From Swiss-Prot:
<dbReference type="GO" id="GO:0032299">
    <property type="term" value="C:ribonuclease H2 complex"/>
</dbReference>
<keyword id="KW-0963">Cytoplasm</keyword>
<keyword id="KW-0378">Hydrolase</keyword>
<dbReference type="InterPro" id="IPR024567">
    <property type="entry name" value="RNase_HII/HIII_dom"/>
</dbReference>
<dbReference type="InterPro" id="IPR036397">
    <property type="entry name" value="RNaseH_sf"/>
</dbReference>
<keyword id="KW-0255">Endonuclease</keyword>
<feature type="binding site">
    <location>
        <position position="18"/>
    </location>
    <ligand>
        <name>a divalent metal cation</name>
    </ligand>
</feature>
<dbReference type="GO" id="GO:0006298">
    <property type="term" value="P:mismatch repair"/>
</dbReference>
<protein>
    <recommendedName>
        <fullName>Ribonuclease HII</fullName>
        <ecNumber>3.1.26.4</ecNumber>
    </recommendedName>
</protein>
<dbReference type="InterPro" id="IPR001352">
    <property type="entry name" value="RNase_HII/HIII"/>
</dbReference>
<feature type="binding site">
    <location>
        <position position="19"/>
    </location>
    <ligand>
        <name>a divalent metal cation</name>
    </ligand>
</feature>
<dbReference type="GO" id="GO:0004523">
    <property type="term" value="F:RNA-DNA hybrid ribonuclease activity"/>
</dbReference>
<keyword id="KW-0464">Manganese</keyword>
<dbReference type="GO" id="GO:0005737">
    <property type="term" value="C:cytoplasm"/>
</dbReference>
<dbReference type="GO" id="GO:0043137">
    <property type="term" value="P:DNA replication, removal of RNA primer"/>
</dbReference>
<dbReference type="InterPro" id="IPR022898">
    <property type="entry name" value="RNase_HII"/>
</dbReference>
<comment type="similarity">
    <text>Belongs to the RNase HII family.</text>
</comment>
C-alpha cells in the first residue's frame, strides 16, 4: 500500500503526477497532478492505491473522496489524439502532465512522477518507478486520471457504439477489434499505432 513517506521526507508542497492512456488504440492520454496541503487522513489514505489494482467501485469512492477533500489540490490535463499523432505518445504524456501541473494553481517544491523517464516540468522532479503503489500523492493522481479518462471514453462510446469503449476504455480488446472490422476507423483512433495503421494500409491496398 502507498504511504506518505516520500512527501514527508522532502517537506514543502509535494505533488504526485501520473498519466493514464498510454496504450489504448483510441482516445486521448490524461494526466493528473495531486498535492496535499496536509497529510491525508487515515480514512482517505485507506482508499488510495494504484488505480489499476482497485475495483471500479472503490476507485470511484476514492475519486469522490479526493474531489471533496479541501486539502487536496488537483490538476487535470490531457493530450488529444491529434497531438499524440503529431508529437508521439511519450511526448503527449509529458504534455498532459505539464497541463495537469499548470492547473494545480501553484508551483510545488517537488514533483513525484510515476515512471523512469522525466518530463520537463517547472519544478524539481523525482522519478518513482511503480510510484502509484508507493506514494499516496501519485496513487491519488492515478485514480483521478483514470476515472476522468474512463468517463470521457464512456461519453465517446455514446456516439461510437461499435467499439465497446465504455468497457475497454479504447484498449485493443477483441470487442474493439471486431468493431474496427465492422465500422472502420474513427477520428478518435490513433492512426500511428500499429493495429490501426496496419488496418488503414490493408484497406488502401485492397481498394
Amino acid at each position: 500500500m502507498p504511504d506518505y513517506a516520500l512527501e514527508a521526507a522532502h517537506g514543502g508542497l509535494v505533488v504526485g503526477i501520473d498519466e493514464v492512456g498510454r496504450g489504448p488504440l483510441a482516445g486521448p492520454v490524461v494526466a493528473s497532478a495531486v498535492a496535499f496541503t496536509a497529510p491525508p487522513s487515515e480514512t482517505l489514505s485507506s482508499l488510495l492505491d494504484d488505480s489499476k489494482k482497485l475495483t471500479a467501485r472503490r476507485r470511484m469512492l476514492a475519486y469522490e473522496a479526493l474531489m471533496a477533500d479541501e486539502q487536496a489540490l488537483i490538476g487535470i490535463g490531457a493530450a488529444s489524439v491529434a497531438e499524440i499523432e503529431r508529437i508521439n505518445i511519450a511526448q503527449a504524456c509529458y504534455l498532459a502532465m505539464r497541463r495537469a501541473l499548470s492547473r494545480l494553481g501553484c508551483t510545488p517544491d517537488l514533483a513525484l512522477v510515476d515512471g523512469k523517464h522525466a518530463p520537463k516540468l517547472p519544478c524539481p522532479i523525482k522519478m518513482v518507478i511503480g510510484g502509484d503503489g508507493i506514494s499516496l500523492s501519485i496513487a491519488a493522481a492515478s485514480i483521478i486520471a483514470k476515472v476522468t479518462r474512463d468517463r470521457l471514453m464512456v461519453r465517446l462510446a455514446v456516439r461510437h457504439d461499435a467499439y465497446g469503449w465504455e468497457r475497454n476504455a479504447g484498449y485493443g480488446t477483441a470487442a474493439h477489434m471486431q468493431g474496427l472490422k465492422l465500422r472502420g476507423v474513427t477520428p478518435h483512433h490513433r492512426r500511428g499505432f500499429a493495429p490501426i495503421r496496419n488496418m488503414i494500409e490493408a484497406e488502401a491496398h485492397a481498394a
